[in-house]
Amino acid sequence: KENAFFFYTVFKNEFKNFILVTDDLSPIEIESANIEIISPVLKKGKYKWMGYFSGEPIIFSMQSTEFKTIVQNGDIEFKNGSSINCFLKIKRQIDNEGVEKIIGYEVVRVNHYFENEKPIETKEGKKHRQTKEAQKNQINLLDDLGLAIKEK
């Protein structure tokens, strides 16, 4: 990577706008991320999972209590290539040089997991999908009503 330097003049009255209150950046949220599981956590506790995301190995915390319970009860058998589709939150910070760094990964919700390449929808995944579909249908209904009212 090449280092590029940009110069910008900051006037005294604007200076306060350039001071960072925190080095935390807003997290990147991915609604439908696929993670291949390398190392699941089969025991209760706040242990970290390992997986592959976008071709890179990652360590992540599993926030989905429903999925953790399914795993701890032995209802899911993990094999080479087992994966999940999930809502992934990527936490970021900015360092002293202004470089963005990833500081953690969190799986907030598991939409579905795969058994023999067949997706199995979780209860929380189904609930989220139905809520999203209902919101979409409401918007479409309101749009249709809006058009009907405008045409009269």
Regions found by a protein language model. Name each.
Residues 40-67:
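OB-fold (S1/OB) nucleic-acid-binding surfaces
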Residues 67-87:
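Short nucleic-acid-contacting surface segments enriched for D/E, G, S/T with interspersed K/R
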Residues 1-31:
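Charged, alpha-helical interface segments at or near domain boundaries
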Residues 27-45:
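Structural detector for short beta-strands of small beta-barrel domains
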Residues 91-126:
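OB-fold/S1-family single-stranded nucleic acid-binding modules
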Residues 33, 49, 84-86:
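Hydrophobic residues positioned within well-ordered beta-strands of beta-sheet architectures
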Residues 41, 81-99:
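A short, charged
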Residues 114-152:
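Extended, charge-rich, solvent-exposed interface segments
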